[in-house]
Amino acid sequence: MSVDHQAEARRQIEICNACRYCEGFCAVFPAMTQQRTFALADMTQLANLCHNCQGCYHACQYTAPHEFAINLPAALAEVRTESWERLSTPTWLAKRVQTHGGLVAGLMLFATIFFLMWSQGVVGGNTFYDYFSHNTLVAIFAPAFVLPLVVIAWSLRRYWREVGGQAVRWAHLKSALKAAANLKNLSGGQQQGCQYEDGDRYSHKRRAGHQLTMYGFLLCFASTSTATVMHYALDMPAPYAWYSLPKILGVVGGVMLSVGTLFLMKLKRTADPKLGSVSRWGGDWVFIGLLFLTASTGLLLWMLGATPAMPLMLAVHLGCVFTLFLMMPYSKMVHGFFRLAALTRDAQTNGG
């Protein structure tokens, strides 16, 4: 781990703790005021509590060219991404994925070619189950989904021990889930929004983009979960009609996820890279792009139906999903898990 990033973030936090002008912006500043010195665990917790709304930067009187050169969003972003890498297993892979987006693109291309070659032996298929049986898909994707979750669980365990987390009560989890659900820490403190893409102007655009993306993803996950229950518990195997619950959840979720990620990409084009982790900027783009491709190819697959283009779109979609699953512990996908853990720990320290 880079000692320079830790030292720089600590220097800035200590100045901010003396100033306290920004303590109404987000959860970072009230948490910061509870102590005078900041160890590695404290910096890890504060960094993951930060949502990079950037409001504190635009309100600060000590940014460059002042000699203090405060840029807290960037300093915490570096510590935050390094904490994901340091606490993951293996660490080198996490760092590689965060800084080399081409690795993710290469895996997606390889997976797509694999699924395309697999489907070549089928002639005249009408549904994607004619190309890949249910059991085949389960055999491929169940390990690709479960094993990364095990890695994430291990990373969160290490995080929890590092920040001194205690036994979680329902009140702690409820507080964290509420803050995550409404993205309270992207509200700017006074519900005026944050300043991510418009310089020093307030906006709720980033909050809206994140909510579209988050809830779209959750609806897609609910679609898959519902289909699983219908298949195994109710003996109702796929394919399902357009008006069935899995289809409705999947289509609505896919549209929300596609629109949300497109919106976030638009905002990211106008954002200032210097207020985030510059070395991981490319990795952020790849992650958002992969989410968009996963959602949009799923929608296209549904719309194409039994057309000749269906096998190709099926291979691309499965390649995207496979890559998204495998890269969960190492891409920015993991930030949601760490942020929820940080919010839970914050609720504990505040007696929530």
Specify the residue positions occupied by each region the protein language model found.
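Charged, low-complexity surface segments at secondary-structure and domain boundaries
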Residues: 1, 61-65, 157-164
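Iron-sulfur cluster-binding cysteine motifs and their immediate structural context
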Residues: 17-38, 44-45, 55-83
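Membrane-embedded alpha-helical bundles of multi-pass integral membrane proteins
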Residues: 77, 83-352
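Residue-level detector of secondary-structure boundary/capping sites
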Residues: 17, 51, 69-70, 253, ...
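Short acidic (Asp/Glu) and glycine-rich catalytic loops that position anionic groups and cofactors
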Residues: 53-60, 269, 319-320
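Short, intrinsically disordered terminal tails adjacent to the first/last structured region
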Residues: 1-4, 352
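Immediate flanking context of iron-sulfur cluster ligation sites
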Residues: 3-17, 40-54
